[in-house]
């Protein structure tokens, strides 16, 4: 394999630096996506605080968005370090960079896979069960906050039989707002789109990261063979 590598490290480190710049930008995208998801899914923490929520809802409201945000920040730091060690041809630094990127790749695949799993699962049914349990309890104020945030009224048509409009947002004249806009449609669409975005971003970044890892490994081999590392 080694004989097919470029004769000088330059032809390996330049693509590696370019890939790290691309990954830095994608890391910034992850931070933005993570920030949006933290703000959005934090609304479901109120369901968690009043008790009785499933593990799926706990995961998408806390661990998943926080994980995406953390990975994005770590990605940005690591890719800057990758550019530096590649430019200076520091073999030890490249080894640590490769190990950390490999760990990050595994975590990224895990979070991306988790997001796509929840996207394909019927998470709406689990939200519905918790929603309706809370609607008719002494914690119904949580539903009022969620309906105000999502600009909807009643979870679905079946709620209309149970006078769900009593919890719907109202204007200054006590008129019901968003009547006919059911929360199931709004929430299910918003949750699914964000989960799909996280999963797709994880897969796309994982592919580019894998290519970057290959260039880093080839550069390590070339530096070792040429004894040019310091």
Curated annotation (Swiss-Prot):
Lineage, uppermost ranks: Eukaryota, Amoebozoa, Evosea, Eumycetozoa, Dictyostelia
Protein name: Probable tetraspanin tspD
Family membership: Belongs to the tetraspanin (TM4SF) family.
InterPro entries from the UniProt entry: Tetraspanin/Peripherin
Record's keyword terms, sorted: Glycoprotein, Membrane, Transmembrane, Transmembrane helix
Regions that span the bilayer: 21-41, 66-86, 91-111, 201-221
Membrane-topology descriptor: Multi-pass membrane protein
Glycosylation sites: 133, 138, 163, 179
Cytoplasmic face residues: 1-20, 87-90, 222-230
Topological domain spans for side Extracellular: 42-65, 112-200
Encoding gene per record: tspD
GO cellular component: membrane
Cell compartments where the protein resides: Membrane
């Amino acid at each position: 394999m080694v004989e097919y590598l470029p004769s000088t490290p330059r032809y390996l480190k330049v693509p590696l630096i370019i890939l790290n710049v691309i990954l830095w930008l994608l890391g910034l995208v992850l931070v933005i996506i993570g920030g949006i998801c933290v703000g959005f899914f934090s609304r479901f923490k109120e369901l968690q605080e009043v008790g009785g929520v499933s593990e799926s809802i706990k995961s998408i409201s806390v661990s998943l968005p926080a994980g995406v945000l953390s990975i994005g920040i770590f990605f940005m730091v690591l890719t800057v370090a990758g550019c530096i060690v590649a430019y200076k041809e520091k073999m030890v630094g490249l080894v640590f960079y490769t190990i950390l990127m490999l760990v990050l790749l595994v975590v990224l695949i895990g979070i991306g896979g988790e997001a796509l799993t929840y996207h394909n699962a019927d998470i709406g049914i689990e939200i519905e069960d918790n929603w309706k349990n809370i609607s008719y309890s002494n914690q119904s104020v949580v539903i009022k906050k969620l309906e105000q945030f999502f600009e909807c009224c009643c979870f679905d048509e079946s709620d209309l039989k149970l006078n769900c409009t009593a919890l719907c947002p109202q204007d200054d004249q006590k008129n019901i707002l968003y009547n006919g806009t059911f929360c199931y449609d709004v929430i299910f669409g918003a949750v699914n789109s964000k989960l799909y975005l996280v999963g797709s971003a994880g897969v796309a970044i994982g592919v580019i990261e894998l290519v970057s890892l290959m260039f880093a490994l080839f550069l390590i081999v070339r530096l070792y063979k040429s004894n040019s590392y310091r």
